[in-house]
Design a protein with these regions (language model features):
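Conserved beta-strand scaffold positions in the cores of enzyme catalytic domains, especially
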Residues: 43, 77-80, 161-163
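Glycine/proline-rich loop-helix segments at beta-alpha junctions forming the active-site rim
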Residues: 112-210
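Short acidic, S/G/P-rich loop/turn micro-motifs used as interaction or catalytic elements
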Residues: 49-54, 84-88, 105-113, 143-147
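Anaerobic metallocofactor- and corrinoid-dependent redox/one-carbon enzyme cores
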Residues: 93-94, 102-108, 138
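Short His-Asn-centered micro-motif
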Residues: 45-47, 56-57, 80-83, 138-142
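Active-site and ligand/interface coordination hotspots across diverse enzymes
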Residues: 1-70
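Short connector loops at secondary-structure junctions
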Residues: 73-99
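Flexible, charged surface loops at secondary-structure boundaries
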Residues: 34-39, 70-72, 125-134
Length: 210
């Protein structure tokens, strides 16, 4: 049988959550992927509009705080997205570079489906690979569906996963982080690159890894 064409997926809904190619990509990770080493910390982080995620504005800024810990092999980034649970070293590969999920188009039904599908995938990942990590933490908005899915998966597995991001910051910090650009100001994850959030991230990493 001829292999399916590598398409670009743009939209929201079940088609962009649990069907081809994301379902197959998830199964392939469970079947063939292995973390490169044993890590002190597995850090769950959000996806980004820019692809690959590592070159997006949000990831570029908070990775500057993570950089020393990544270089020392202490922290492994694990990205949570409608496309699945994506280890950082796979974020430059299809299909994770070829989709656009617009959160402004989500309905409550779609959000519930997102949480349900992502929770299952997180549970799969933690069950398969938790032996590669001493512990886990998150750095994502407290009001995000990804954090809700992660908390539920952790609860069912009996794991404690703390969120190193602050619940909120001064709105003036958001304006500063957004550089006055509308495309940045519209991103709710802008909170993660504010001064307060980045300081909180660094303090949390020092506490966990010091």
């Amino acid at each position: 049988m001829r292999a399916p064409t590598r398409v670009y997926l743009r939209g929201v809904g079940r088609r962009y959550l649990s069907e081809w190619p994301f379902n197959e990509a998830h199964e392939k990770i469970l079947r063939e992927y292995r973390p490169a080493r044993h890590y002190r910390l597995g850090l769950f982080i959000p996806c980004a509009y820019g692809k690959p995620y590592s070159q997006s504005y949000i990831h570029y800024l908070f990775r500057r705080t993570l950089a020393p810990y990544i270089r020392e092999g202490l922290v492994h980034e694990i990205i949570l997205t409608n496309a699945g649970v994506v280890p950082r070293e796979l974020d430059e590969y299809w299909p994770y570079t070829a989709y656009d999920w617009n959160p402004h188009m989500e309905t409550e039904e779609i959000r519930a489906c997102y949480r349900r599908v992502l929770k299952k995938r997180i549970t799969d990942y933690l069950t398969a690979f938790s032996g590669y990590y001493d512990e886990f933490a998150a750095y994502m908005r407290h009001d995000s569906d990804s954090w809700a899915a992660l908390r539920e998966a952790a609860r069912e597995l009996g794991l404690e996963i703390i969120n190193l991001a602050p619940p909120s910051v001064d709105p003036r910090e958001l304006e500063e982080a957004g550089l006055g650009l509308p495309e940045y100001m519209q991103d709710p994850d802008l909170l993660l690159v504010t001064k307060t959030a980045l300081e909180r991230l660094d303090e949390g990493l020092r506490r966990l890894l010091g």
